[in-house]
């Protein structure tokens, strides 16, 4: 039964449904699980970030529909070092004025959307923070970039449902 659930989760993840992320994360163990096991559970990463000490961080963003982005770090020995869900208040607080789009993407993963505002001369990226439910509306975290590609501010808003 456990093997069937794992296979179903892998299939759903491969087609972009994050419903099994909870199970996948719980069954992976830093210091024990291998890069092969991570790929079996999560599929290929959307982006690979090379780290100075030789490890690699794989990005698994569930944006725009999901409110998760997993940064999974694999050591040079091909063993899982860490799994971090980066769509959270601690990571948002690390976004600073003057950062580049690449630095922000490295911290938060692929944004749910990007929009250019002609009058303000700003590009705004947004990430879904909370999906919302029948009682709550979805909430987004935003990062604004100036024409030089530097962070000029952050914010959040709630998208009211009709």
Predicted regions and their residues:
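Residues within mature, well-folded domains
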Residues: 20-162
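Sec-dependent bacterial lipoprotein signal peptides
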Residues: 1-18
